[in-house]
């Protein structure tokens, strides 16, 4: 019997694609190569700064209902914020809040602290390295109280405007930068809308920062198109809330540290209430002194007897 021949291994040919190669994109300057486009886009994309600002908003225990409503108004205006439960600890409040900020993945904090059910203090903090600012909040008017006609879409990004005197001193420049970072909503945030329809106004009057929120309104019909940049027809309608910030101290760290600035014109609410009590006590003392003076005057100047006083008594 003859030997069987060894069959050589059959090599399978690679399948030929019937479809034509994908056509490159055409531009005004010619055909666009995908490889060059990818290479050119990598360093440009890597150099783009992405704002990942997140703000933790919380308050202390035993806060007044008006101040709690103000905090909820701020939460509704800032879609990039995270609301947390009330903080109880007093002695270690700074350490507790710093830990909360780290757990929530936030970089800033707005802490509303209420004392004696009357006074509201607001901490504006950059964590973990600072700085931090402590304000006394006055002239609080919430959206529910004002009932203004302005209305803007929830989650839309605001335009931030500052008065010119923010550039006068160094501490005002620092406060302007902190307000810009905290109240400025990051572009492309998942809870924000990609356009502007309201304005946050920060103005300095009598060394106080006054906050206002206005809607940008453009009256038009459905058939009419809005001219781009037509500022003559645009009007501002106030939405709310309103409040006034009186800066007390600026610290170098988060919820403490070295004092960078202290307001020399600040007067605490306790001193104001004590002065009012003294004035009231002075009014009461003046009344008592007036009564004693009147009695002494009556004793020193008695009435002369009248000859007709007992005329009808004999009958």
Curated annotation (Swiss-Prot):
UniProt keywords, alphabetically: Nucleus, Ribosome biogenesis, rRNA processing
Effect of gene knockout: Delayed growth rate.
Tissue expression pattern: Expressed in roots, rosette leaves, stems, flowers, siliques and seeds.
Any one Gene Ontology molecular-function term assigned to this protein's record: rRNA binding
Location relative to the cell: Nucleus, Nucleolus
Stretches assigned to the Brix domain: 53-256
Region (Disordered): 1-35
Basic and acidic residues bias spans: 19-35
Keyword Magnesium: no
InterPro entries: Brix, BRX1
A single GO BP: rRNA processing
Domain of life: Eukaryota
Short name of one Pfam family: Brix
Entry annotated with the keyword Transmembrane: no
Record PROSITE patterns: BRIX
Biological role: Involved in pre-rRNA processing and required for biogenesis of the large (60S) ribosomal subunit. Required for proper development.
Stated family: Belongs to the BRX1 family.
UniProt-recorded name of the protein: Ribosome biogenesis protein BRX1 homolog 1
Name of the gene this protein is made from: BRIX1-1
